[in-house]
């Protein structure tokens, strides 16, 4: 379950902060990476093999979140308060508490529901130590080109490796837009991984520190 969350959560971030045109950019980037790595077919086969119970899990789920802030200049080193607000927005959306929950388009009313997923910043790190759930890594990269440096923020020397994706939802916050010079901007991306599949080391969500975080306007 935890491994399917990054891709689903990306829809929340994108819905909150960007236009439909930008959503297409993120989808194109994600699909291209999966095709280049030969993962698209693997994902389809793996999902086909999942029992129905895993796709429609009942009950509730609490997901520990590890937020990795990878920054070059101080403006990119987003404060704890912004991250806490981001987690609150995620919980509103996934518990049906967002203000416009009742205004969903008629096309989707039949599929609307509350998945009973709660997100919280991790309190224990992979080594068993107490943590705030937030890591901060200063990088020499002025920004990460989403076309050429898609996953550079997820490992040294440019960034930081994910915490165990079977136990945590990893979110990287960094600059993936400032060098694009206008036009279409990729504000975030994620992949749809399945446990044991090649590529699990890049599980998680990447969002832009500026365009991908919209702490002041919660609309979904």
Identify what each model region corresponds to.
Residues 18, 48-62, 155-167:
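Short, surface-exposed loop and linker segments with low hydrophobicity and enrichment for Pro/Ser/Thr
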Residues 5, 41, 81-84:
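Generic alpha-helical secondary structure signal
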Residues 21-60, 94:
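N-terminal zymogen propeptides
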Residues 46-91, 173-178, 185, 190, ...:
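Fold-level signature of zinc-dependent metallopeptidase catalytic domains
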Residues 88-220:
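Metzincin-family zinc-dependent endopeptidase catalytic domain
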Residues 17-18, 77, 102:
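Short linear functional motifs in flexible/disordered or boundary regions
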Residues 1-29, 90:
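Bacterial Sec-dependent N-terminal signal peptides
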């Amino acid at each position: 379950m935890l491994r399917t969350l990054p891709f689903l959560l990306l829809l929340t971030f994108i819905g909150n902060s960007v236009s439909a045109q930008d959503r297409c950019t993120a989808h194109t980037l994600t699909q291209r990476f999966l095709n280049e790595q030969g993962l698209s077919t693997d994902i389809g086969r793996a999902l086909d093999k999942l029992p129905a119970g895993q796709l429609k899990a009942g009950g509730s789920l609490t997901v520990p979140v590890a937020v990795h802030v990878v920054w070059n200049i101080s403006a990119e080193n987003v404060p704890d308060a912004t991250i806490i607000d981001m987690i609150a927005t995620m919980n509103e959306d996934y518990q049906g508490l967002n203000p416009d929950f009742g205004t969903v388009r008629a096309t989707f009313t039949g599929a609307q529901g509350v998945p009973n997923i709660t997100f919280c910043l991790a309190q224990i790190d992979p080594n068993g130590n107490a943590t705030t759930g937030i890591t901060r890594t200063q990088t020499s990269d002025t920004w990460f080109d989403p076309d050429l440096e898609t996953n550079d923020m997820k490992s040294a020397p440019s960034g930081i490796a994910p915490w165990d994706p079977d136990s945590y939802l990893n979110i990287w916050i960094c600059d993936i837009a400032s060098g694009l010079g206008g036009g279409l901007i990729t504000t975030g991306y994620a992949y749809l991984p399945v446990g044991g599949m090649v590529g699990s080391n890049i599980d998680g969500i990447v969002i832009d520190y500026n365009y991908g975080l919209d702490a002041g306007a919660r609309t979904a």
